UniProtKB/Swiss-Prot annotation:
Xref: Gene3D superfamilies: 6.10.140.1620
UniProt main location, coarse: cytoplasm
Region (Disordered): 179-273, 279-298
Gene encoding the protein: ABIL3
Outcome following mutation: K135N: In strain: cv. Ita-0
Extent of Low complexity compositional bias: 204-215, 240-255
General function of this protein: Involved in regulation of actin and microtubule organization. Part of a WAVE complex that activates the Arp2/3 complex.
Family that this chain belongs to: Belongs to the ABI family.
Name listed for the protein in its UniProt record: Protein ABIL3
Basic and acidic residues composition bias: residue spans: 279-288
InterPro entries: ABI (IPR028457)
PANTHER family: ABL INTERACTOR FAMILY MEMBER, PROTEIN ABIL3
Length: 321
């Protein structure tokens, strides 16, 4: 127990190496004391045994032995606790050192990786400035079988390609022009404008009904004279013919005659739809202005028609009027 009591006090260390060396020496001394504790206990037991045999005051020897055994046990437990604490402290310190070393290594690796990425980026930027990138243009193939004629427009097959120089571009432009010349667009029909001298003399807007009045009655029943210059073509459907039915054979005094407007050489020809609309507007008259004789004949023809016959007789009758 004298070795444990005479343990030297650690001196203040100046740097990290001295501190680690001092701690390692203290740990080794603690292990030596723990190893010598067994020999000390055995020597104390032999001493008390001899004293108890040779000494007459055995009661005093027994009391002294009890006190020594208690102190020796307490010192042993204390010594084991201190050694255990030192071992744990040493292990924790080494673990912390390892963790700190790993952290520093990871930081160094991260810095190296960032430096490498920066160097690669700078190298790529420098190479991009040095390298002359080629310019690509569009190339068009114009096979004669795939061109669809549609006026001045043609459907082209677009294929991405590259032109090596200005000569290729000139050849391509000449080929396109030659192809366009080979496939001329279909001719567009233009309206032929005739001079006023070549046109036929137009009829005047005034009408004379003396010839109609002096004509025989049969001819008047067959066909009514149309006051318009361009009469409409008749068809077989009944839905289109009501305008022709409402037209009377003889003009009434209350009905105003709408003359056909004159056309000049510079005026474009009107379409058929415009002419039909104009004639329909001119033919809109109230039904009460029709002559009673014609309505009677129409009613008589409808009543005298047989049921077995078809509507051809009615259509022919309506076509006459």
């Amino acid at each position: 127990m004298s070795a444990a009591a005479t343990m030297p006090m650690p001196r203040e260390a100046s740097n990290y190496d001295e501190i680690s060396m001092q701690q390692s020496m203290l740990f080794s001394d603690s292990l030596k004391d723990l190893k010598n504790l067994r020999t000390q206990l055995y020597s104390a037991a032999e001493y008390f045994e001899l004293s108890y045999t040779n000494d007459e005051q055995k009661q005093i020897v027994v009391e002294t032995l009890k006190d020594y055994a208690i102190k020796a046990l307490v010192n042993t437990v204390d010594h084991l606790g201190s050694v255990t604490y030192k071992v744990n402290d040493f292990v924790d310190e080494k673990v912390d050192e390892v963790a700190g070393t790993e952290l520093r290594v990871s930081c160094i690796e991260q810095r190296l990786r960032m430096c490498q990425e920066y160097m690669d980026h700078e190298g790529r930027s420098q190479q991009s400035l040095v390298i002359d990138t080629p310019k690509f243009h569009k190339r068009y193939f114009l096979p004669s079988g795939e061109i669809k004629r549609g006026g001045n427009l043609a459907k082209l097959k677009n294929v991405e390609g590259s032109f090596d120089g200005e000569d290729d571009w000139n050849q391509f432009r000449n080929a396109v022009r030659a192809t366009i010349r080979e496939t001329p667009p279909p001719p567009v029909r233009k309206p032929i404008l005739q001079s006023p001298s070549q046109r036929k003399p137009q009829r005047s807007a005034t009408f004379s009904f003396s010839s109609i009045a002096t004509a025989p009655k049969k001819e008047q029943d067959k066909r009514a004279v149309s006051p318009h210059r361009f009469p409409l073509l008749r068809s077989g459907s009944v839905a289109i013919r009501p305008s022709s039915i409402s037209r009377p054979t003889t003009p009434s005094k209350s009905r105003a005659v709408t003359p056909t407007p004159k056309r000049y050489p510079s005026e474009p020809r009107r379409s058929a739809s415009v002419r039909v609309a104009f004639e329909k507007e001119a033919q809109k008259e109230p039904e009460h202005q029709q002559q009673p004789s014609k309505s009677k004949r129409l009613l008589k023809a409808l009543l005298s028609r047989r049921k077995t016959k078809k509507d051809d007789t009615l259509y022919t009758y309506l076509d006459e009027y």
